[in-house]
């Protein structure tokens, strides 16, 4: 079940629904993750939104530019683009899987094909919770290993 405070966050930021519908109507998944989910649950206002998607950065850039949005690649190695609207900064990152060598804190990154793999790489706090705005107002997604 989605907390009413998270639903309120989405309702107060119609841009999130528009963005989510744009991705879904073009065959892509898009999930709100990270601090925005936390802030929505805790009823804290935010204008910083992170999403994860199965669209590659190139697919996201093409989709967004076709619909007159301005984008910047901010983390090529991490599959992240930044999107601006009039009041929000949005980061959209392709699903990914991180692996670590025993002697390094820097991850080796590869694209993942599903949400659960992406969530499983995140720390096991609120950052591993995802919310699909376009698909369901009824539940949050957690990695199965939590």
Task: Go through each PLM region and give its residues.
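Catalytic cores of the polymerase beta-like nucleotidyltransferase superfamily
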Residues: 1-140, 146
